Each structure stands twice: as structure tokens, then as C-alpha cells.
Amino acid sequence: MMSEIWKCKGFANAHTHLDKGMLVPEVVYVDAPASIRGGWTREKKAEFTKMDIYDRAEKALLQMIRYGTTYVRTHVDVDPVVGLKGIEAMLELQQAFAKQIVIDITAFNQEGFDRYPETEKLLQEALTMGRMGLGGHTLVDVDGKLHIRKMMAMAEQFDVPWLEFHTDESGKPEDFLLPFLAEQALEQECGDKIYAIHCNSLATVPDIKAAKTIELMANAKLHVTVCPTAVATRPITRTKELLKAGIPVGLGSDNMGDLFNPLGGGNMLGYAQLLAYVQRFYEPEEQLALLDMIRRGPADLLSASSHHELNVSVVFETQEARELLSHVPLPQIVQDKVCSA
């Protein structure tokens, strides 16, 4: 019954920021409001080189692989501060690690159009450099709805394979743009390409409003990505309710060793364990649902094909979901035999 658990194709990290990761311990973490740490991050980004980004991201990837991750989707900042250095580095890593892990890249509008209008042209240039998705953030511009519209228009113009939004990340009920995003996706019939990351405010709006929004999301065919480390500063979204509605939910590490989270080793079982504790995924079926979340490979067909072609399997000695989530054991990474025709 559980054979797929002890031997699988590997784990999926649905959301991270490899370009800004592994700054700690060289940079000493200091706790401060998010806006202050965002400013510090911009200062560091101005110092980034392509090789610096490559080296730090490589370190994170090697850790992920050690823990059994064979698929990762990473946001990469694109703005006048860092330019296209992160995209260039990640495209090189994508090729260098092609036989070990599938890396999907999302060109990310972290800073917004208001702060840096030049970002629009840089994002457009990034989208011509290789096959990648596009990423926005519902809270970085004064008019979040306009931000969503502009990002969706760019995604359509360049026919991107996926579009992601850091969605309502503050967790405040007044920052609730998820229904608008779902409405736009439904209207444009593109929800199967759209990923709503975090969705923290869904946890703080009234239950009736949340239920209506989840129904709208399901009708729009949106995907959701949950990052449990966000619990340090805000409520986690309604994961169980989203799963019950049949919405595809993936799990992401989010930040790793940066100025927003100095911890994070890329062990997806560890992140699943954290979510299990925080939201009480304790019943046997719920534990299996958690493992399904971290085994959810890429929905994009080309990425899924690349993932399928990896000659790698992740093997655990136990067949019990409870044991995996309780002890977070290290896997054995094995090379699958390739049968010649």
C-alpha cells in the first residue's frame, strides 16, 4: 500500500529564492521588521555578481539533492538593482544540474513597478533568455489589482508556461486580493497556469468569505503553494480546506539562509513535518496528503517530461508515513537502471 512512499521519484520544492539564499552566515542575521530586512536585501543585491549567485545557489541545490529533492521552482529577482545576473546564473545551473534535479525558473518582480518602472523591460528581456515563468507580488505596488493585471498581460504577451503571485503575504484581511486574482483567472481561462503562493490573508478573513473564495479558486483551477516557515510572522493559509476543495497544493521551503530566514536546509520532509505540527496533519490520510504535496512534480508538461527522464530514485527504509514525518530520515539516493532498446 505504501510502496510509493519508500521509493519515489524524489521530492518537489515548489517555491524558493535560490538567488538570495545562503547569505548567512557570511552576513549576520539581525531581526527587524520585514520592510527593514527588505531594504537590507536590496543593499546586498546591489553587490551580487553572477558568480556569487551561482555559488550560493549551487550550495543550496546540493543540500536539496542530499535530502531527496529532484524538482525545484525558484523565483529569481529581476530589477534595476540586480539586473539579469540571477537569471543568467540560474540558466547555467539549470544545465549543470540537469541530470540530478529539474530547476524551473520564475522571473520575479520582487520590488514592484512603482519603485522601479524599469523592471517591466527587464522582465520582458528575461523572458526572451530561456523558458521560464513570471512572478508577481500583490502587495509591492500601491494598486495591487493593477499589478495583477499588468503581470497577467505580460504573461499572455510572452505566452509564459506559468504565472505565480506572492499573494496577500501580510496576512491582513484588508490585503485580500486572492478573490480578484481568481476572478481574473476565471475570466481569462488561464487559472491552470496560475499559482497563488502563501495566501496568508485567506486564514484571517471570515469563514464564509474564505469558503466562497476557495470555491472560486477551485472553479478557476488555480494552484496554491504553501510555505510553512511563514508561520514565524503570519498565519498559514487554510491548507486542509484547499485540499478538500480539490485545489492542487504544493509545498515550498521559501527562503533559505537569507535576511528573511537564516535557517532552512532544503529538506522537504522537514517542511512537511513543520506543517503537520502547525496545522495538525495527524490523521493517517492527512499524513499521506502531506507526502503527496512534497511529491507533487511539475504540472508543466515539458518540466514533467524532464523530471520523468531523471534516472534517480529516493529510497527510505521505512514504509510508514508517520515514521517519515516523525523522524525526517535521510534518504538513499539511487541511480535507476536505464534499459537500452
Functional labels for PLM-detected ranges:
Residues 6-7, 24-75, 81-98, 121-127:
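Alpha-helical scaffold segments that flank or form the walls of functional sites
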Residues 111-114, 127-235:
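Active-site core of metal-dependent hydrolases
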